[in-house]
Amino acid sequence: MIGVIDAGTTTIKLAVYDEDKLVAIKKEPVVKHNPKPGWVEIDAEDLARKCVSFADTAIDEYGVEVIAITNQRTTAVLWDGKTGRPVFNALGWQDMRANALAEEMNRDSTIRMARTAGMIARGVVKLLPTLKNKRRVKWLITLSRLSIRPNHTSVKLCWMLRELGEKKEKYDLKAGTVDSWLVYRLTGEHLTDYSNAAATGLYDSYYLRWSEPILKIVGADEEMLPKTLESDRIFGEYRNVPVTGVIADQSASLYALGCWEEGDIKATNGTGTFVDLNVGEEPQASPGGLLPLIAWKLKSEMRYMMEGMLFYSGSAVEKLKEIGIYDDVSKTSEMAFRSKNDDMLLIPSFTGLATPHYVSVPGLLYGISNAMTREDIVKALLESIAFRIAEIVEIMRKEFPYETDRIRCDGEMSSNDFFLQRIADVTGLKVERGAVLSGTSFGAHLVAGRALGKWKKDFCMPFDKVFEPSLDLSEKYRRWKRLLEISKKLKV
């Protein structure tokens, strides 16, 4: 038996697996606070208590051999090593309070010089293309797009340290992401895995070390941060049960969906959408704005990935429910299929656009008329999210021309047939839906199972449906992209 604690954006779950079978699942809500518009805080103490309670349940009721952890990334937790208690509420990955601070940090001379060096490297590669595959050159090219963003752990940590000011001397400060916080509360060890570290904005994924220049800008030191371990190492014990299979949510999904080879693409459609491309054993650079991350580092292998994201997808569908467009999100696929309107377009910018734009633009609904229906609005929303995914896939296929004919999908929003069909139609790739929508916990259980020697890598979740491209959406997609460019320039 393997128990997986899955700390997501809205719920923390315990999933218990017997080999490949899910035998139990328990859920509790993640307690969040929104003290100001754009602020998203998580009660870190409550999260830790629920984690410990789930670990007790896994041991006492199911006799698990091991406890695994998977989690939302980039949420920042700061706690006192003397007491083991959080100093602040955790700042969630959707928290945008540090917009101005991120802009200030991006004006730092270190960041500006790094970008300049990166632009020079890009110019050199155009003249000498043979250099583009050298790790140092790829590292420099990545610096050309270096930008500290409000959703990074780095800027959230900087905000908390500045808020503390001189008071920080009272504490034995320890910082990390949700995985390291939960590992600490279970085992007393201050550890993280490579997939979580790489997403913080504090870590150099090329050379596998915390970035001293970024730490200096943030005002932190390396002693404050966790040590990195391979995901299938033992992170400690809780009640004599080993903790292993510690892996970030998107990496766990990539693993669970069997995207183990270069060129494999998956899209996890949950609160937001995360599109990830396996690029193999070497880190890569993306002039187009994809994020270079570590997919996983295990004792026997390492994989890198490039990522593009949408801040709002499933949460956008929930928003339309909140305002009364429908009373049940499960109805949205059927509603969208009923719509005959092909003129309505929507720009799904609720708190701005992520990859590859990273700009704050107004959300737009175009093509309203006295004949429009609720079904038309639902269709426009689902298509707009599919179009945003297509933007990211376009960059991936342009920069990394692997031979691939499919995208694999998981996440709760992937239960929507209309949505997945539109992804297939606009990308021209078949879409395979995982039979287990919660790929995060399934992937963590696979990694923990490997740590125990239960199975080899060639075991992943099954797939319950394949969506083949069946409609030419190229003209509608072109019009949508034109509307997106208009929205960027729109000032009222």
From Swiss-Prot:
Superkingdom of source: Archaea
Molecular function in Gene Ontology: kinase activity; phosphotransferase activity, alcohol group as acceptor
SUPFAM superfamilies: Actin-like ATPase domain
Alphabetized UniProt keyword annotations: Kinase, Transferase
Protein's GO biological process: glycerol metabolic process; glycerol-3-phosphate biosynthetic process; triglyceride metabolic process
EC number(s) per entry: 2.7.1.-
Gene3D superfamilies attached to this UniProt entry: 3.30.420.40
The keyword Transferase is assigned to this record: yes
Entry annotated with the keyword Kinase: yes
A Pfam family recorded for this sequence: FGGY_C
PANTHER family: GLYCEROL KINASE 5-RELATED (PTHR10196:SF68), SUGAR KINASE (PTHR10196)
Family the entry assigns: Belongs to the FGGY kinase family.
Record protein name field: Uncharacterized sugar kinase AF_0866
Provenance organism: Archaeoglobus fulgidus (strain ATCC 49558 / DSM 4304 / JCM 9628 / NBRC 100126 / VC-16)
